[in-house]
A protein has these predicted regions:
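Flexible, small-/acidic-enriched active-site or ligand-binding loops
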Residues: 173, 229-256
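Amphipathic, small/basic residue-rich leader segments at the start of a protein or domain
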Residues: 1-125, 136, 141-145, 149
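Hydrophobic, small-residue-rich alpha-helical packing segments that form membrane-like cores
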Residues: 166-170, 185
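A short, Trp-centered hydrophobic/proline-enriched beta-strand micro-motif
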Residues: 153-162
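Conserved small/polar residues in nucleotide/adenosyl-binding loops
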Residues: 259-261
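A structural signal for short hydrophobic beta-strand segments in well-ordered beta-sheet cores
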Residues: 176-179
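Flexible, glycine-rich active-site loops centered on histidine and acidic residues
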Residues: 131-137, 159-160, 214
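A short core secondary-structure module
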Residues: 184, 188-235
Length: 261
């Protein structure tokens, strides 16, 4: 197992007046949590990762998990939850740990050293960003149906934005449309490199669409929640990043055809 060098916090650093915004040190308050995360990764996640890999060696479908893989992962997740190592990314105390972004960055740097650490502590993308969207602007019903199981680590999600024919990192270029017909939105479009849709546990999509083409360029877009099993949601196939398709989660080419929401 790879060993990582620990670089301790500098203790003799002195701030000049007015330099508070440039202080990028970890806070003293989060140090015990950070150390706990490191220990949990070493003692629980890394051994579990070996067992997880072995449990998947015999599977015939690369786009799935074996029951044994899910079992060992859930055991580690439940242990993390019991030890309070859960949902670090949300800044409020009710749904998250109440961490500042800087302190979370230190913890995230440790999570990134092990392929399954983030998921074990329910801090995997794109779920983290999707949960924050739901937590901040979701309705009570949306939070109960989608945010709650995401916070509990029971389901996975995807954020559906990138498109094949436009520079869609700029949302003003989005071409996928959602038109209001009666009391339903009808969605049509094509999406590229959608992370996580291949995961069989993915149950909800947050889809970036254009709903008001006549508005100012920055006000034409909306995000619509689309259940993964909605008729018209079609995965055309996996796409490759640095020669890898990252099965079973994947980065997918998708078509959205006459989806009614």
């Amino acid at each position: 197992m790879t060993k990582h060098t620990y670089i301790p916090r500098t203790t003799n650093y002195t701030l000049n007046p007015g330099d508070e915004l440039n202080d990028l040190r970890m806070s003293d308050q989060v140090r015990p949590l950070y150390d706990h995360v490191r220990k949990f990764i070493r003692d629980t996640v890394e051994p579990m990762s070996i067992e997880f890999a072995k449990a998947g060696e015999s599977k015939e479908d690369r786009w799935s998990f074996t029951p044994k893989q899910l079992e060992v992962l859930e055991v580690a997740k439940n242990k993390a939850k019991k030890e309070g190592l859960w949902n670090f990314f949300l800044p409020d105390d009710e749904t998250g740990q109440g961490l500042k972004n800087l302190d979370y960055a230190y913890i995230a740097s440790e999570l990134g050293k092990s392929p399954l650490a983030s998921e074990t502590m329910n801090c995997s993308a794109p779920d983290t960003g999707n949960m924050e969207v739901l937590e901040r602007v979701g309705t009570k019903e949306q939070k109960e149906k989608w945010l709650k199981p995401l916070l509990n680590g029971e389901i996975r999600s995807a954020y559906v934005m990138t498109e094949p024919n436009v520079a869609s990192s700029d949302a003003k270029n989005i071409s996928t449309t959602a038109k209001l017909v009666g009391d339903e939105w009808v969605i049509n479009g094509e999406k590229y490199y959608i992370s996580g849709v291949g995961d069989p546990r993915c149950k909800i999509l947050i889809v970036m669409v254009k709903t008001n083409p006549d508005a100012a360029p920055s006000k034409q877009q909306s995000q619509i929640l689309v259940p993964r099993d909605t008729p018209g949601v079609e995965v055309l196939g996996p796409m490759y990043v640095f020669g890898q398709d990252h099965a079973p989660r994947g980065h997918m080419h998708m078509r959205l055809s006459l989806i009614h929401i």
